[in-house]
Amino acid sequence: MTQGICFILKPNMSIPPAFIEKETPFITRFGLWMAIWAHVLSGVATLFMVFPFANLKTRHFHIQQWSIKLLKIFGIQLRMMNPGILPSNSYLLASNHISWLDIHAINAFKPIRFVAKSEVEKWPIFGWMAKQLGTVFIKRDSSRHAHLVVGEMSAVLKSESVCIFPEGTSTIGEAVRPFKPNLFEAAVMADLPVYTLAIRYLSKATGQRSDVPAFVGDMGLLESMSKILKNRNLIAELTFFPPPAATPQQPSDRKWLALHSHEQIAKYLSSSNTL
């Protein structure tokens, strides 16, 4: 029987060499940047030459394969928890938000439509790609525009699942901010379940939560990409939770759905951080 080894670090105690994070060599990073731009160009070509003539199944195949390769370039391993609970029919997925990588980690598992902040649409190349993939863009802090987006989402949910990031911003992933309930109305209108997703990024070396992928503050996209390439060997962990069961005493409305999803993620992150 194989026994595990547990390291307990005390003050002034050094980290075992095997667990020290190693920075990616410059020459390797240069090659990875070349691989990224080649991969982006291949994605643009696919969007131009394949997507206009492809059915949904074919588009999903290309999206998944493109995302899998992107994660590989960045040295990110995908780990799923409870993926079998997701249904084959449409649903709304509510997730915490840490990084631009979140979208690609989810798509590498199972392609889905996203709702993203309107600023993403203005990103060079990547904004255009997101638009071609059917991303629904929302203006933050605009309740009027949110109402229009809810109508668009409910129409999309008739044939495809949709993922939202109800925090309205990204965080380092240590905790989850309160969820804004507006977009949950789309699931109520479409009479579809709301599944919850908790995202964490972990260091392969230590198994602990990593801030490296966090896309926060005034950080630019290229700056974030460079930071991740410099500190590769990460794990993107996706943990799925089932929808709540509505009762006559507690009907399913957007505020209740938002609160339930938030509590699931908050509880999970809190327990994970204490391990």
What are these regions (language model features)?
Residues 136-157:
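A membrane-cytosol interface segment of integral membrane proteins
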Residues 1-20, 73-83, 101-103, 115, ...:
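Soluble, non-transmembrane catalytic domains of enzymes that act on hydrophobic metabolites at membranes
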Residues 42-54, 58, 72-73, 86-143:
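Catalytic core of membrane glycerolipid acyltransferases/transacylases, capturing the structured
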